[in-house]
Amino acid sequence: MSRHYRLTFPLLFSLLLLVAGQAHAQKPLALWRPATPAARAAAASPEPASWFTLDAAQLATRLAAAPPETRPTEAVTLELPYPDGTLHRFALTQVPVMAPALAARFPQIRTYAGHAQDDPATTVRLETGPAGLHAQVTGPTGVHSILADPAAANRYESRQDAPVKFDCKALPNPTAQQPLLRTTASAPTAPYGSQLRTMRLALAATGEYTRQLGGGTVAGTVASMVTLVSQLNAVYERDLALRLQLVANTDLLVYLDPATDPFDNSSPVALMNANEAVVNAAVGVSNYDLGHVLGYMSGGYSGIAYVGVVCSTTLAAAGASTGSSAGLMATVLTHEIGHQLGSAHTFNGDQGNCAGGSRSASLAFEPGAGNTIMSYDGRCNPDNVGSAVPYFHAGSISAIMSKLSCGTLTANGNHPPTLTVPPSGYAIPMGTPFSLAGTGTDADGDALTFSWEELDLGNASGLAGAATDATAPPLFRSFAPQASATRTFPALSSILNNTASTGEILPLVARPLNFRLTARDNHSGMATADVSLTVAAAGPFRVTAPSAAISAAGSSTYTVRWDVLGTDLAPVNCANVQILFSTDGGQTFPTVLLSSTPNNGTAQVTFPKTATTQGRIKIQAINNVFFAINSGNITLSGSLPVELTAFSAEARATSAHLAWATASEKNNTGFAVEASADGTVFRRLGWVAGQGNSSSPSQYQFEDGTLAQYGNPTVYYRLRQIDVDGTETFSPVRSVAVPAGLAAQFQVWPNPARAAVSVAGVAPGQVVQLLDLTGRLLLQKTQSTSGPLQLELPSSLAQGIYVVRANGQSRRLVVE
């Protein structure tokens, strides 16, 4: 079965020449070895990064064995570095980006695609060429690139990709276009992905681009183009089952001299206006499906394109992208070609650049600036929603699919996924959280990823006024596709922390809500399903007791209260609710306190015997999708279902040694050993099985070999004892004093974090800074005492990746 993987690595031109004559009797050496960061790294942007030295000869040998994509079972395995310094194994095959005739003229340029063996939803595009190796890895947690250091042979940086801000002008298609004369094919309908569509891309380069970003040569510029198109195909193949392939005479579109090329590089408009004639003359109007031109812009990025001109006899090459870095231009190019393929802008904001007339009323599905490929991510302050995601919104996909009427279709042996979603028609109360849960299956066993997105169109609206706008503008931003087909609106973390989630706005007016669930198999297959809700003039539905943190005894009774506010009446018609209990702060609710009770605002429950400091109550509407969670943790006292006679923890060199004993045990599955740097937030370290049922004494021990990781002078330990029925109870907490020197290391915890972090290894007088991935300072605090510094995170901080910096050291921080 043929599969189309994501990969892009540029490799040194000389690498493949070293394949012949390699001595196979030599002991294998590591492909990557840790390297000293380049001197310029200290002044570089603060994206998490790591540095490695590449064994170029070994890489050439291993890539030479890569099979074509039609033989995926023979894929070669290659280790690739991540920004955190770890190595991950990828399965790679050769994937064409150039037409065969073009590839024959530039044999030093090779392209590959693949997926991570430990996470099939993480893909890579890799290429080798005159400038070295380049790779871009895309997964549920983001995108990072492996880049050659031009100052040192075989030294590479693995760096988290930074967002790129650019100016864009989308122009409506002025006429009804006619399809090209050859390779026509009908537009697809979802689900799709059993065929891959290949379209011929005529990509031109100005003399300025060639000199500044292509090394001044045709070969270097073609290699740069291949890198860009490989990155585009990672997205287009995944979301659109579409592959772009550089036309055979692409080298004729590469210009070396700005003084003699046919382009005016002064603006994207001038470039676009000239490109149609240039491409038609060099390639021929019937020999390409889509055209674009690359220019150079010092210190910025910009683009322009007509919308929906792909496959046309005129304006098919009406698009231009300019920038100052070839590595970052893929973001611009993906967006601009997205216009040519058929998608207008998807933002609905009316502030900043969003107020400039580029909004499309028919595709404005994203609140504020939006954050998918066709949005104005980061350019519409104060309506930026943050956390750009490199995929097409469901609305963009529909618009593009309706325009794909040309290209060559090839069966790829893939089977699209199938989807099941809740029925439409639920009425929910205003200002009340809700969840939508789907399920997906894949005949090929592919690891599916899912995204729930809103499909509502209303008046242009800022984030501040959207909740009460009866014209039904979009309220909920997009998030990167995840392994779960369930989404909670707004994010569960904001509900539990009683904070606002930027770009997730609960409606406060009666209106419709429309959503689409998209399932991707990450092999060009996709399925979609829609769900419609109605927001009624009822609610908000919320828990009023407990209204804050409380303490109670396990197995005790408690009266839960909530606001009904018309949710028991039409059109919501919620007659009964279910009351659930969580012991992990609201992350899961496995305990049913009442399976069904009238929705009358009060019910008496019996708490479980489980001891916890992180209890929460959830009231879930029966036969509906809305719910409410109480606003504070519930502490329940309890005792272990074993007779614990001893529990100790002590430091031994760099480790902590834990020992405990029981006199007897009843229904004891075992002990989860948990640790905490602050005595409040614990995480699991390991598992020790229990005796089940025993009347005899038992001895247990556990070793925590990494005391330094906590970055704190004191580490806390506890046992989470679990019954055979799943009931959990906790032991007393024990503390360990970390030996001097270990606690002085620079550390940040918890990580991921929500409301606050502790920073260790910071001396009095030193400044701790919080930065986003663009280097923008968000918060700073001076250490005034010894011990960890407590850094409160701003409530307005969006979910995503940040950097904590102090005294020249940096740590990556994930905010949930």
What residue spans do the PLM features occupy?
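The catalytic-center signature of Zn2+-dependent metalloproteases
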Residues: 247-270, 310-388, 453-463
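Fold-level signature of zinc-dependent metallopeptidase catalytic domains
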Residues: 27-38, 44, 155-305
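Extracellular acidic, Ser/Thr/Pro-rich low-complexity tracts
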Residues: 439-444, 521, 563-570, 664-666
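Glycine-centered tight-turn motifs at strand-turn-strand junctions
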Residues: 602-605, 681, 686-710, 756, ...
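Surface-exposed, proline-anchored Ser/Thr-rich loop/turn motifs
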Residues: 550, 641-665, 731-762, 771-778, ...
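Recognizes extended acidic, P/S/T-rich segments that occur
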Residues: 465-500, 593-595, 672-712
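Short, compositionally biased serine/threonine- and acidic-rich segments at solvent-exposed termini, linkers
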Residues: 637-743
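N-terminal prosegments of processed precursors
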Residues: 25-147, 270-273
